[in-house]
Amino acid sequence: SDKNRIRLQPLPPARGYIYDRNGILLADNYPVFSATLSRADVTDIDGTLSRLIPILSLTQEDVDRFNSRVKTARKTERIAIKLNLTENDIAKFSEVKYAFPGVKIETQMTRYYPHGELFAHVIGYVGRINDRELKKIDKDLYAGTNLIGKIGAEKSYEDLLHGTPGYESVEADAHGNVLRNLGRQDPVRGNDLYLSIDYGLQTIAAKQLADRRGAIVAIDPRTGEILALVSSPSFNPNLFV
């Protein structure tokens, strides 16, 4: 059909893992369902977003983030409307999805910190890319990416952990449905990061501090490596992703 179009869609890379000095996993990736919109297939973006608010239970923060990303995203890029959809979100959208050409639910990778508060002050966390960060990042390198390191090792080693996006050339119809794949360059996962922190010593230090306010730092005097770094009160980094 003359209305079919060839487009290049970015494929975001998975983030590199973070380990302690002995190979214990401290920062992991896992798949979640997200609602995304293709700029190339939606003519009335504001109207579409307004109609999706009650269906996907969008917050004002969701709307603001989406609007910020739309301004800088490539024409062929799929932009996240909401990450980590609930079963209820998915069920409600499935009933009306044909009324939203260009909007679909897809699987994306997000971050998970298996030890919660224990390494929060060391690892930090990732979060949605904000306006200030959008102005600084390389648009090509972050095409299709929603998360970026905010504090801690996640931020300090962002360039190492991020990876390189891939691209997929597809033929799509006027509604944005992919008819066939024409070629693909796979994304490259970010590099893994091994910290000097020792899981065992970190656990002992946290138990010693218990619920008291304060901090404990253990340093190897021979090398200067930090083996444990605990601060109380702590926080659950998973709540910020």
Predicted regions located by residue number:
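Short hydrophobic alpha-helical segments used for membrane anchoring or interfacial signaling
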Residues: 216-221
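Extracytoplasmic/periplasmic proteins that interact with beta-lactams or build/remodel peptidoglycan
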Residues: 1-215, 230-241
